[in-house]
């Protein structure tokens, strides 16, 4: 889940494997509210379920006034 100080941010977010290959796109230029949740369905771009392993969530939030926020989180899929 997330909480932003102000509205107006758009978000792009991806899932990468531990080798740095992009596995999935979570959102693409979606307008975010001040609070919310970004959820990934556990599927790769081709629609198949990903294997057990370590993955990286990476998001870029861009505000119309030029602010850019970047977030990265490592997680395990079992």
Task: Briefly describe each language-model feature range.
Residues 3-5, 27, 78:
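A structural detector for beta-sheet-dominated domains
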Residues 8, 22-50, 61-68:
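Glycine-centered tight-turn motifs at strand-turn-strand junctions
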Residues 14, 24, 72-74:
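Small/flexible residues
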Residues 1, 52-78:
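C-terminal tail/sorting-segment detector
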Residues 15-23, 55:
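Short, glycine-anchored, charge-dense loop/turn motifs used at functional sites
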């Amino acid at each position: 889940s997330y909480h932003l100080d102000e509205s107006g941010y758009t978000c792009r977010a991806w899932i990468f494997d531990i080798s740095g290959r992009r596995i999935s796109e979570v959102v693409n230029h979606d307008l975010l509210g001040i609070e919310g949740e970004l959820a990934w369905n556990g599927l790769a771009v081709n629609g198949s379920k990903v294997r057990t392993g370590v993955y990286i969530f990476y998001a870029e939030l861009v505000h119309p006034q030029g602010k850019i926020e970047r977030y990265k989180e490592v997680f395990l899929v079992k």
